[in-house]
Amino acid sequence: MKEIDKYAGKNILVLGLGRSGFAVSKLLLKLGARLTLNDKADLAADPKAKQLADLGVRVIGGSHPVDLFDEEKFDYLVKNPGIPYENPMVAKASEKGVPIITEPEVALSASESPYVCVTGSNGKTTTVMLTQQIMDHYLQKQGHHAYAVGNIGWPISEVVLNQAGPDDLLVVEMSSFQLMGVTDIEPKVAAIVDIYNNVHLDYHKTFDNYVDAKLNVGRFQKTSDYFLANFDQKDILAREEKATKAKILTFSENDPVADFYIGQDYLMHGEEKMMKIADIKLPGIHNLQNSLVAIGISSLMGAGKDDIAAVLSTFTGAEHRLQYVTTLDGVKVYNDSKSTNIEAATVAIQSFKQPEVLLAGGLDRGFVFDSLVDLFKKHVKAIVTYGETRYLLADAARKAGIKTIVVVDNLHEGVKAASKLAEAGDVLLFSPACASWDQFKTFEERGEYFVKYVKELEEK
């Protein structure tokens, strides 16, 4: 941890006692701040709340008392990224002119380790995991490590406080929720894998707001830093060029004009062959793109082709992201629960040459699934739909001419139905194309239940 004066002696309100709220509170205490922690949940029996109270934090649970801002002056409000800006406490802080920041900004300002940041609508977690493993392979030769932190599930504050040293590297996954509140981060390399519409618009309200939040990943970089941009998304690229001072390098699915691109047989950096495509374990063109971005970041940070090959030739996927689960009677089963929108489902469905039995459905967020019709025609032999969107997806399947369409209420029934339809040589693909919140708390929980139900079939 780097000693900084920014938060020393400051009166700070931390909003939300999740894992990141707990971690950033401990870091801020170490940096000399005075803390109040507030969560609308009852914290009377919460062990984390007790631990913070024992360290001198004023803990207030059970409500969001906006009159706190009338009782005393706060220098900062550190909010959980998932808490919307319409929250009464956040709105009151804004009204009072209190700077509103999030955990990543606090943690990265105190990091003595250099860091790189990755964001995007789809693919950021896989890209972060690949980058972390490549860089760890490289750094271990020197006795150091790379850590995958941030939106991937490990609070940056926790690693900055307890693990990472000056010769280590933080590979940071950042969501649009985290980036929206950022006012000062400077990654050595920033990357935006892709940006699609219809993602988190319930939080950001407009697509422009969503893009602006994503662009914060490189907005505060210097000319000595690097920014990796998707050459194939020209409208976004134009905005990236205006947003960052860093040197922009581009990547593309097939255009050799880009700095990094997917060639005929190799992932390329200019004329240099970086990795043989046939040796990459992850399926799908989108994972070649994720691999390409990881290669770009890692090579800029010093890793060699031996480090890249060691990881890409063995890495089989992140949980819930086109994750291979098992083979049932000759049917390969994949868990793509992270597919919470149409774009993510599209890349998953396109990833296989074998006939697919698709299991899809979930929360109805107003998506129109007609854009999947042509894709269904080319790849899907049968479909099982469930959840709030079951009839909408079934209707799209009918338009595609799919003859075998099964509509069920829940995921458990869906797994059983899909397994009966799939034959040896097929792929059973769970790619919901919808958020999980109609029946599950998170896409991770949804994916865990999918794997559980598949394993139950395997044991019969």
Swiss-Prot record:
The keyword Lipid metabolism does not apply. Its EC number is 6.3.2.9. Disulfide bonds: none annotated. It is found in: Cytoplasm. GO terms for molecular function: ATP binding; UDP-N-acetylmuramoylalanine-D-glutamate ligase activity. Transmembrane segments: none annotated. Pfam families: Mur_ligase_C, Mur_ligase_M, MurD-like_N. This is UDP-N-acetylmuramoylalanine--D-glutamate ligase. It comes from Lactobacillus delbrueckii subsp. bulgaricus (strain ATCC BAA-365 / Lb-18). The gene is murD.
